[in-house]
């Protein structure tokens, strides 16, 4: 037997025992049981032998009925007992867990009569706090609705879902159906199948809360079935059956072991007592558990059943009869009204016999379901209509006569037309009761049409900007490159004047006032101003890219060299110069260099003629945010400015001047070399003079035997070369020797002249720099 007497955990007045925790502590003593405990409840009809079963199975000491005296209620409220002793077929040597057994007051007792509130709350409490709920029933009760407590189980399942169904865990309860007085005529498997089917049917008919619509019975419960022989007529077999049942409570690791981890609430024992008390408080206070009378229950059940049948018939005929009519408003509305009226009429014919408030409540719910189902078809029709109307609007806008009808006028007329047709269709559905509220659809339609018109407006604007860009960008590039390739001191004034005039020419069609534009697509004044600003940004970026891409070091050197050569090589009338003296070359060199360097500073920094730096009047880039971003460093470690006017750095300017100086020096050298070539040319009369004056020497050579021998050798050599045609190789050898000699002489001469000229040039550059600084 149990080591301590049972206590009444919840009395018949529905009060929770306040000393429950002390009872648990007395049962376990000083042991720390942790999670190694289990809770079992028994549930069933009054006088069905629940307490007797618990006493035999768990060696508890619950009060039992003496059938020889009187059949009456014995267990009142919910009683709790502790045990570690389970009646089994074999002795278990290992330490057995602590088991707490709840004996629940029997249902359907005459003492409470029609008051079923407590038995339902007690059953719900047992499911909420137990790992295993033993449902005690007789074999002859199976197949009954009230007798085997199925009605009570349905209510408990429904309320259990509403209270505990949304918990995000995998906790389950084992429903252990103990079938008493099982004589074996009907197999246990057949009995279990019957009970399982009843439970599954009950579950599908439950009114499930939001979030649990798709839940299954097996998401919350596991089912087991055990048969016990008759206690009096088959006492030995009954005892043996109970022991076999006890094996499943103690033999861990076996397939039929009942205390599985997913059944445990994972709370320490003192936490479980608090949990149990809170559960009872919640169950006791929850209004959903103040259940209506049996008549209302029947009305709700039957009207729900009738409603579901009518709805199923409606759905079965819906798709087949509606599909061919989706494109025709008149036929579609007629068929929808017909189907809806047929469904409601069928419900009214059968459900109107029950309680009116329940009947009307379920009718309203059915009507809502019908409208919800129909709303999908209506939305589909309206969306299809919207697409058709939108296609018509786009076609009307694109095919308009642009000479007489503006984009804004065309869009406004089309919008008014499609809104009228759409609203007329929607009102048709509403008048026939197929559409309860059109506010949401109207708002969605308005938002949709505004969004689509915005897309149409954006496309029109993109096309306009594209046409402007197509003309503006190449014009700017051509004009700017032309002006920069032939620069003057006022080149930046010319560029800016051309810049403004090019922009103005390309958007003059949209100008309404000075600095005010209307791009004729229905935009506000601020939006038009923003577009104008974007066009200026485009123009400035084009100008910036063109200037900085064109004015590279090599290009600027080429421009300076061309200006130099225009003055150095040609006179004022454009004729080529013929140099006579070095002084003439040096004088032309100074004038040409000054002319070339006049635009050097102009090409290095973009400033107007009054020495004002050119600054864009719009942001050049989105990331532009002040001076912190104006200076950057390139891959070669050179610092640059992002400001538009800054074209060359000081280092780049030195590089340009160095390359320019080298190139013009070569030009000067070539000019001076032409004078030297002229001076070193030998006149023909010199050869005649040499022949007359050198006759005596010639005769002396002939008379000398050595000279004669040398002459013969040379003559023989000449003969052999001529005889065998070897003049080609000989000429090549001679030319190579002469060429090498000439190159060596030129290098020496150039070195001499360049050194002399660079000395003069350095002095002249210093004088030029000083003069420029004085002029500034």
Swiss-Prot record:
It comes from the Eukaryota. The chain crosses the membrane at residues 682-702, 706-726. Its main location: endoplasmic reticulum. Keywords: Endoplasmic reticulum, GTP-binding, Hydrolase, Membrane, Nucleotide-binding, Stress response, Transmembrane, Transmembrane helix. Residues 1-681, 727-776 are cytoplasmic. PROSITE patterns: G_GB1_RHD3 (PS51715). One of its GO terms (cellular component) is endoplasmic reticulum. It is a multi-pass membrane protein. Its EC number is 3.6.5.-. InterPro entries: G_GB1_RHD3_dom, P-loop_NTPase, RHD3/Sey1, Sey1/RHD3-like_3HB. CDD domains: GBP (cd01851). It is found in: Endoplasmic reticulum membrane. One of its GO terms (biological process) is endoplasmic reticulum inheritance. Residues 703-705 are lumenal. One of its GO terms (molecular function) is GTP binding. Cooperates with the reticulon proteins RTN1 and RTN2 and the tubule-shaping DP1 family protein YOP1 to generate and maintain the structure of the tubular endoplasmic reticulum network. Has GTPase activity, which is required for its function in ER organization. Interacts with RTN1 and YOP1; GTP binding is not required for these interactions. HAMAP family: Sey1 (MF_03109). Present with 2265 molecules/cell in log phase SD medium. Belongs to the TRAFAC class dynamin-like GTPase superfamily. GB1/RHD3 GTPase family. RHD3 subfamily. PANTHER family: PROTEIN SEY1. This is Protein SEY1. The gene is SEY1.
């Amino acid at each position: 037997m149990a080591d301590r007497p049972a206590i009444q955990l919840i009395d018949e007045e529905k009060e929770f025992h306040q000393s429950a925790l002390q009872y648990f502590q007395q049962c376990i003593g000083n042991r720390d049981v942790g999670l190694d405990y289990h809770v079992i409840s028994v549930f069933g009809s009054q006088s069905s032998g629940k307490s007797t079963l618990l006493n035999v199975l768990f060696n508890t000491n619950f009060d039992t009925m003496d059938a020889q005296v009187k059949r009456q209620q014995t267990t009142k409220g919910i009683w709790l007992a502790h045990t570690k002793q389970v009646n089994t077929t074999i002795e278990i040597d290992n330490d057995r867990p602590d088991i707490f057994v709840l004996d629940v007051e029997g249902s359907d007792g005459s003492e409470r009569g029609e008051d079923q509130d407590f038995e339902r709350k007690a059953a719900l409490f047992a499911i909420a706090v137990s790992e295993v709920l033993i449902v005690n029933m007789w074999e002859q009760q199976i197949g009954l609705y009230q007798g085997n407590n199925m009605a009570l189980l349905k209510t408990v399942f429904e309320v259990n879902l509403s209270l505990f169904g949304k918990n995000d865990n995998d906790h389950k309860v084992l429903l252990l159906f103990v079938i008493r007085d099982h004589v074996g005529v009907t197999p246990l498997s057949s009995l279990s199948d019957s009970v399982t089917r009843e439970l599954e049917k009950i579950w599908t008919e439950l009114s499930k809360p939001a979030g649990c619509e798709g839940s299954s019975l097996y998401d919350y419960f596991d089912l087991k079935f055990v048969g016990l022989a008759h206690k009096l007529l088959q006492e030995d077999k009954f005892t043996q059956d109970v022991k076999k049942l006890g094996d499943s409570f103690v033999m861990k690791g076996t397939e039929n072991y009942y205390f599985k981890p997913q059944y445990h609430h994972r709370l320490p024992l003192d936490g479980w007592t608090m949990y149990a008390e809170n559960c009872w408080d919640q169950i006791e206070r929850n209004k959903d558990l103040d259940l209506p009378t049996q008549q209302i229950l029947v009305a709700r059940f039957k009207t729900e059943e009738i409603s579901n049948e009518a709805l199923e018939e409606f759905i079965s005929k819906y798709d087949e009869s509606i599909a061919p009519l989706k494109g025709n408003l008149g036929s579609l509305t007629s068929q929808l009204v017909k189907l809806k009226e047929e469904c409601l009429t069928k419900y009214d014919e059968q459900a109107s016999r029950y309680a009116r408030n329940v009947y009307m409540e379920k009718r309203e719910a059915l009507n809502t379901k019908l409208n919800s189902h129909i709303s999908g078809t209506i939305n589909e029709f309206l969306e299809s209509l919207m697409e058709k109307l939108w296609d018509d609007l786009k076609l009307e806008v694109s095919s308009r006569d642009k000479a007489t009808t503006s984009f804004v006028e065309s869009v406004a007329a089309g919008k008014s037309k499609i809104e009228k047709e759409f609203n007329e269709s929607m009102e048709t559905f509403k008048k026939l009761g197929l559409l309860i509220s059109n506010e949401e659809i109207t708002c969605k339609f308005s938002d949709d049409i505004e969004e689509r018109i915005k897309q149409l407006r954006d496309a029109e604007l993109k096309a306009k900007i594209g046409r402007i860009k197509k003309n503006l960008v190449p014009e700017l590039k051509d004009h700017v490159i032309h002006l920069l390739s032939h620069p003057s001191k006022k080149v930046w004034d010319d560029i800016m004047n051309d810049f403004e005039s090019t922009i103005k020419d390309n958007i003059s069609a949209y100008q309404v006032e000075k600095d005010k534009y209307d791009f004729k697509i229905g935009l506000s004044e601020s939006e038009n101003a923003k577009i104008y600003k974007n066009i200026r940004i485009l123009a400035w970026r084009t100008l910036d890219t063109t200037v900085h891409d064109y004015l590279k070091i090599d290009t600027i050197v080429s421009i300076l060299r061309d200006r130099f050569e225009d003055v150095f090589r040609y006179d004022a009338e454009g004729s080529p110069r013929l140099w006579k003296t070095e002084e003439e070359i040096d004088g032309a060199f100074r004038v040409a260099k000054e002319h070339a360097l006049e635009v050097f500073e102009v090409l290095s920094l973009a400033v107007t003629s009054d020495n004002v730096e050119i600054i864009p009047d719009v942001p050049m880039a989105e990331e532009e945010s002040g001076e912190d971003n104006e200076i950057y460093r390139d891959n070669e470690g050179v610092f640059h400015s992002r400001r538009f006017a800054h074209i060359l750095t000081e280092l780049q300017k030195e590089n340009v001047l160095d390359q320019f100086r080298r190139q013009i020096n070569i030009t000067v050298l070539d000019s001076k070399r032409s004078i030297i070539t002229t001076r070193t040319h030998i006149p023909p009369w010199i050869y005649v003079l040499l022949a007359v004056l050198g006759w005596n020497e010639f005769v002396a050579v002939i008379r000398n035997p050595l000279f004669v021998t040398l002459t013969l050798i040379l003559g023989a050599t000449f003969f052999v070369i001529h005889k065998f045609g070897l003049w080609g190789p000989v000429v090549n050898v001679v030319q190579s020797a002469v060429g090498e000699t000439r190159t060596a002489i030129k290098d020496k001469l150039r070195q001499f002249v360049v050194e002399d000229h660079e000395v003069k040039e350095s002095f002249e550059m210093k004088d030029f720099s000083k003069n420029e600084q004085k002029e500034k």
